[in-house]
Amino acid sequence: MLHKKYRPNVAAIIMSPDYPNTCEVFIAERIDIEGAWQFPQGGIDEGETPLEALYRELLEEIGTNEIEILAQYPRWIAYDFPSNMEHKFYSFDGQKQRYFLVRLKHVNNIDLNKHTPEFRSYQFIQLKDLLKKIVPFKRQVYRQVIAYFRKEGYLGC
């Protein structure tokens, strides 16, 4: 059996500033794949901790890293790229991720064009509607991480 190679990555489940009064989560549509909605995420640079990568990636991707960290998923969680996407990600078979549950402090600080844009648009949607909107190959990971945050009492909706 071949050993799979996964790119180290962080991902953020961003709750709206109104959480826990509302249960809305931030998702963004990739600029390179129309209709591909996901959480902000990105690679961990050499020598960088997952937390440092989280703050850097949020600033790069959504223009702000003004967040409150609510929880961190305790383990790496991996997913494979669909076979038709592997060519985009060099020699990796997929990504292994550290997930953070965060609350955004200010919606008006979001700026998808602050750096090189990775997303074309964003929205806050009800958490219960999330899996219908997300690309299929990420649904199982999202389901698992959200279930953990709920079970542990970090996510109350």
Curated annotation (Swiss-Prot):
The keyword NAD does not apply. Its cofactor is a divalent metal cation. GO terms for cellular component: cytoplasm. InterPro entries: Nudix_hydrolase, NUDIX_hydrolase-like_dom_sf, NUDIX_hydrolase_CS, NUDIX_hydrolase_dom, RppH. Pfam families: NUDIX. Keywords: Hydrolase. Gene3D superfamilies: Nucleoside Triphosphate Pyrophosphohydrolase (3.90.79.10). Residues 5-147 form the Nudix hydrolase domain. The keyword Cell membrane does not apply. It is an enzyme of class 3 (hydrolase). SUPFAM superfamilies: Nudix. One of its GO terms (biological process) is mRNA catabolic process. GO terms for molecular function: mRNA 5'-diphosphatase activity. CDD domains: NUDIX_Ap4A_hydrolase_plant_like. A motif (Nudix box) lies at residues 42-63. NCBIfam families: PRK00714.1-3, PRK00714.1-5. This is RNA pyrophosphohydrolase.
